[in-house]
Amino acid sequence: MKVLVINTGSSSFKYQLIDMPMEQVLVSGLVERIGEEVGQMVHKIYPNTSQEKKYTTTQPFSTHVEGMQAVVAELINPKHGILHSVKEIYAIGHRVVMGGETMKHPALINQHVKNIIRECAIFSPLHNLSHLAGIETAEELFPGIPNVAVFDSEFHQTMPKVAYLYPLPYDIYDDYKIRRYGFHGTSHRYVAQQTANFLNRPIKELNFITCHLGNGCSMTAIKNGKSIDTSMGLTPLDGLMMGTRCGDIDPAIVPFLIEKTEKSAKDVDELMNKQSGLKGICGMNDMRDIHEACAQGNAKAQLALDMFIYRIKKYLGAYYAILGHLDGIIFTAGIGENDTIVREKVCSGLENLGIFLDSSRNNTHSSTLRLISTDNSPIPIFVVPTNEELEIAKLTIQLVSNTQ
């Protein structure tokens, strides 16, 4: 069964065609610069295999529909297309960032679900409205094929009130549903389940702290296989220091900046989302560049790295305290999977908590799930490559199969 997985942004979208249950990626691609004078599509057949072939197209895509039409043309291309017809696609899975309190599970997309995605756009306007554009494009170009929404926030709907409520007047929650929602849920769920499989134990028996560290960063406390707390909040701005996002700050900073700098609320929001974090401290948001600058004695780069590590350690300690018992720490995403220095610094000094990193294992690069703690470490440490597209494909197949 072939599942098309789509992740739509405001001016781009990524896609994969996955053959299930073999979990073989037949096609992956990216259409970007939608709405600009010149757009680009990169379309790969059998990616990351010896059979990989890449096709690049440069042309204007005025809308998401035009971009997806170009993808369809490649999928059924008489010379190198994977499909004879788009009717071979069993289902389409869409990543949707925000599902609010209503969407606790993946959902077959109908008008009601689209209305909820639109309503939740008040908390994530750029993401949710883009996802809607992707969904409506798929409905237009793939008629009769079921579409499924998989929400970033749904995994965290198991958090208790003590974790998700903000200590504001309760009426604000009642009236506006302002609370912690959390994000990266598809990734946190996937790597936790993969680790449970590796340990050959049921996920419902296991407690993990998952660290999704990329340009966007979040951590989750998982108790008996369920999220009980997570670092991102009402929006993805909360929590850890990130590439360009500030993470936790004193809320009083916002009105202070508006008053003193005469910036608008929108300007301050942009500053916190796009000009802060690692970039705000040292001018760089790529961790590889920061490591290089640190090696050259750049004090601000070193400060940015130290602040980044410090915040992760704070959350790790806090989540250990609320979990009580820990079956593993999991690193994932771009930095978590590939950055040996960050992992070493995060784990350094935590031996009294039962966390012992094995330097040799940590410095061994691999694209597979692996243990990087010592054999006698009371708490094992894992590196687990995330695969949100595969998780979306699995959940899509499961839902569509159960409803037919």
From Swiss-Prot:
Enzyme active site: 152
Enzyme class (EC, first level): transferase
Cofactor info, note text: Mg(2+). Can also accept Mn(2+).
Swiss-Prot/TrEMBL site (Transition state stabilizer) positions: 184, 245
Cross-referenced Gene3D superfamilies: 3.30.420.40
Places the protein is found: Cytoplasm
GO biological process, one term: acetyl-CoA biosynthetic process
UniProt keyword list: ATP-binding, Cytoplasm, Kinase, Magnesium, Metal-binding, Nucleotide-binding, Transferase
GO cellular component: cytoplasm
Pfam families (UniProt xref): Acetate_kinase (PF00871)
EC identifiers of the protein: 2.7.2.1
Pathway note: Metabolic intermediate biosynthesis; acetyl-CoA biosynthesis; acetyl-CoA from acetate: step 1/2
Required co-factors: Mg(2+); Mn(2+)
Positions contributing to ATP binding: 14, 212-216, 286-288, 334-338
The keyword Cytoplasm is annotated on this UniProt entry: yes
Single Gene Ontology MF annotation: acetate kinase activity
Reaction(s) this enzyme catalyzes, per UniProt: acetate + ATP = acetyl phosphate + ADP
Residues engaged in binding Mg(2+): 7, 388
Sites where the protein binds substrate: 95
Family annotation (InterPro entries): Ac/propionate_kinase, Aliphatic_acid_kin_short-chain, Aliphatic_acid_kinase_CS, ATPase_NBD
Assembly: Homodimer.
UniProt cross-references to HAMAP family, sorted A to Z: Acetate_kinase (MF_00020)
Family annotation (NCBIfam families): ackA
Family label: Belongs to the acetokinase family.
Protein name (database record): Acetate kinase
Source organism per UniProt: Lawsonia intracellularis (strain PHE/MN1-00)
Lineage per the UniProt record: Bacteria, Pseudomonadati, Thermodesulfobacteriota, Desulfovibrionia, Desulfovibrionales
